[in-house]
Regions:
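Conserved glycine(s) of the Walker
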Residues: 156
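Conserved catalytic/coupling modules of large nucleotide/cofactor-utilizing molecular machines
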Residues: 231, 249-250, 256-495
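P-loop NTPase nucleotide-binding/switch module
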Residues: 68-70, 77, 97-145, 150, ...
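Loop/turn-to-beta-strand initiation segments
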Residues: 173-176, 202-205, 237-241, 290-295
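Residue-level signature of catalytic and energy-coupling elements of molecular machines
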Residues: 9, 14, 67, 89, ...
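Acidic-enriched and Gly/Ser
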Residues: 1-5, 12-130
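Conserved P-loop
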Residues: 159-203
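Phosphate-binding/switch loop-helix module in NTP-utilizing enzymes
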Residues: 138, 218-254
Length: 495
């Protein structure tokens, strides 16, 4: 093995640094260190000729100048892996940033790993149960698959991610890894404290490439988190839930790096290698014969343009799309998942079974009919609908409320005990609502419950009988509209 030789900086242009080595030119992805204490980290991305390499700085380049000595570390960027990383927060270099004690006993592993070979991949299409009714029934996730979570600010995206972490730990005895790419420092701190209060921190790892860091660090933090996830899958034989926020920021960081490196931009200014870079990250997320990495990724769609190259390349890797609706969030229907916009490739009769598939299709059909009838209701009122259409509206509104669910991670805010609902209980509840078994129950009896059997107890304790409540106005408060009975559907959807 060649002994790394010292080099010297020959040019600095922003985050791009050219270094001269008289012998033993470092290979691609080698990590170089400069500065008095080696605090400036540079990753080699190109070999310009026999003497020069070009790299991108993963740290601020303040204090770097021509002639500064550079040390070749002799290897790629590495991060710690093992049980010791659980409950800790790291940056792209694997340094702890939670103000806790430094790691003592750990092993290092390169962030640049090859995807698992096809021979090791599991070809079974297995359902990944989340314990969340709306997801498990209408858009089931794939074990070892990738789901995109589309949502703006304030619609419950972080709460949904937090609940998935909670359920993964309790239900699967797995490990959860949160990867913040371009994450705001404030959001990262809030999430850390939320996880700590929810009691899920002992079985999770958090890795952040914050918004104020150079593009090189944001570009590599996803690979660092995946390396930790692969250890738990391959060495510990455990299931891993990987949450990425936001995958668009990974592409954006790659675009910045590409521009700094002088590459010719592609469509809309994106890097010409975007497809390859995204595939290198996404293809490592897979289920093997030893375990699975299931990924939930927040996806930002620029200007709501689904033909944007970043969105197109991301969609090609996703097995499920979960769309959060601001309108449903404003009505208090949490989780605010839009059942008509969301979809999953796992929702097929050969995978979930004929009963599950038929129920999901019937639920979507009911919601679609309800959407079409809303305009008529807002203009003419519910009384102008035929008896059959009124039944459709009643079923849809009861299904909407049954698919809401109190979360464990929001108990301290709502005062409601969290519910983990099995797929069988969720399907049974939807089926009984579609059969009109609960047509005499007030809608609010189905709101924020777990299994359908809880509706009877809630109706007795909180509400008057349906025959009396039909003649009464909805209860005042923020949820008045959403708790309205079918007779008040016109009021609830005037806007």
């Amino acid at each position: 093995m060649k002994t790394p030789s010292p080099g010297a900086v020959v040019s600095v242009r922003g985050s791009v640094v050219d270094v001269r080595f008289d012998e033993n030119l470092p290979p691609i992805h080698s990590v170089l260190r400069a500065g008095d204490e080696g605090q400036i980290v540079i990753e080699v991305l190109a070999q310009l000729d026999a003497r020069h390499v070009r790299g991108i700085a993963l740290t601020p380049t303040q204090g770097l100048a021509r002639g500064t000595a550079v040390e070749d570390t002799g290897g790629p960027l590495k991060v710690p892996v093992g049980k010791e990383v659980l409950s800790r927060m790291f940056d792209v270099f694997g340094d702890v940033i939670d103000r806790g004690a430094a790691l003592s006993d750990f092993q290092l592993r390169s962030v640049h790993q090859a995807p698992p070979p096809l021979a090791r991949r599991s070809t079974k299409s297995e359902i990944f149960e989340t314990g969340i009714k709306a997801i498990d029934v209408l858009m089931p996730l794939e074990r070892g698959g990738k789901a995109g979570l589309f949502g703006g600010a304030g619609v419950g995206k972080t709460v949904l991610l937090t609940e998935m972490i909670h359920n993964m730990v309790g239900q699967h005895e797995g490990v959860s890894i949160f990867c913040g790419i371009g994450e705001r420092c404030r959001e990262g701190q809030e999430l850390y404290h939320e996880m700590k209060q929810a009691g899920v921190l002992p079985n999770m790892v958090m890795v952040f490439g914050q918004m104020n860091e150079p593009p090189g660090a944001r570009f590599r933090v996803g690979h660092a988190a995946l390396t930790m996830a692969e250890y738990f899958r391959d060495d510990e034989h455990r299931d891993v839930l990987l949450l990425v926020d936001n995958i668009f920021r990974f592409i954006q960081a790659g675009m910045e790096v590409s521009g700094l490196m002088g590459q010719m931009p592609s469509r809309l200014g994106y890097q010409p290698t975007m497809g390859t870079e995204l595939s290198r990250l996404e293809e490592r997320i897979a289920n093997t014969d030893t375990g699975a990495i299931t990924s939930i990724q927040a996806v930002y769609v620029p200007a709501d343009d689904f033909t944007d190259p970043a969105a197109v390349h991301t969609f090609s890797h996703l097995s499920a799309s979960i769309v959060l609706s601001r309108k449903r969030a404003s009505e208090g229907l949490f989780p605010a998942i839009d059942p008509l916009q969301s979809n999953s490739k796992m929702a097929a009769p050969g995978i979930v079974g004929a009963r599950h598939y038929g129920l999901a299709q019937e639920i979507r059909r009911t919601f679609a009919q309800y959407e079409q009838l809303k305009d008529i209701i807002s203009m003419l009122g519910l009384e102008q609908l035929s008896p059959e259409d009124r039944n459709v509206v009643a079923r849809a509104r009861r299904l909407e409320r049954f698919l809401t669910q109190p979360f464990f991670t929001t108990e301290q805010f709502t005062g409601l005990d969290g519910k983990l609902v099995s797929l069988e209980d969720a399907l049974d509840g939807c089926e009984r609502i579609l059969r009109d078994e609960y047509k005499d129950y007030p809608e609010s009896a189905l709101y924020m419950i777990g299994a359908i059997n809880e509706a009877k107890g809630k109706a007795k304790s909180d509400l008057t009988p349906a025959s009396e409540s039909a003649a009464k106005a909805p209860r005042p408060g923020p949820g008045a509209k959403l708790r309205a009975t079918p007779e008040h559907a016109g009021d609830a959807h005037e806007s």
